[in-house]
């Protein structure tokens, strides 16, 4: 019987904690952001698979298109991944002729190749269409508001 009481007490306190947890708007927003991301990621991965890319490689191409000449560490920092993870992806992408490293001073700088740029140009319209479809439940104004709020949140992080 003591075990049963312990279980009931445990359930009760978990229930109370969950109630308090879900009353917190920041926690609810966090959970919802995670859920949306988890629903979009598989569709994005499937779309990219058709181009023989994965989401990490797409992020690398997209970032280098905007900021060519980054070091491997700068690129890893921009994409919030480890230098080792970045090295893995860059080796595969170099083998495919999508990126190349050029020595500049004591560091190697990363650049898109013509093939990398072509593949990104092919992927971008499909990526945009998929994201537009997944955000179709929001008006254009709501999308802009959400982007602004998330940008504000992103820039407030240490």
Task: Map each language-model feature to its residues.
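Central "turn" residue of the DNA-binding helix-turn-helix
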Residues: 52, 68-69, 80, 139
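Residues within the alpha-helical elements of helix-turn-helix
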Residues: 63, 78
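Helix-turn-helix DNA-binding motif, specifically the short coil turn and the N-cap/start of the second
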Residues: 82-85
């Amino acid at each position: 019987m003591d075990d049963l009481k312990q279980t009931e007490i445990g359930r009760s306190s978990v229930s109370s904690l969950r109630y308090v947890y879900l009353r917190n708007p920041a926690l609810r927003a966090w959970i919802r952001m995670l859920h949306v991301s988890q629903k979009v990621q598989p569709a994005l991965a499937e779309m990219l698979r058709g181009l023989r890319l994965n989401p990490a490689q797409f992020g690398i191409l997209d970032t280098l298109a905007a900021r060519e000449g980054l070091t491997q560490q700068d690129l890893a920092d921009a994409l919030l991944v480890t230098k080792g993870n970045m090295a893995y992806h860059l080796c595969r992408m170099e083998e495919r002729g999508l990126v190349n490293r050029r020595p500049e001073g004591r560091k190697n700088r990363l650049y898109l190749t013509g093939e990398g740029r072509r593949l990104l140009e092919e992927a971008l319209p499909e990526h945009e269409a998929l994201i537009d479809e997944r955000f179709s439940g929001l008006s254009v104004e709501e999308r802009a508001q959400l982007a602004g709020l998330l940008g504000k949140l992103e820039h407030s992080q240490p």
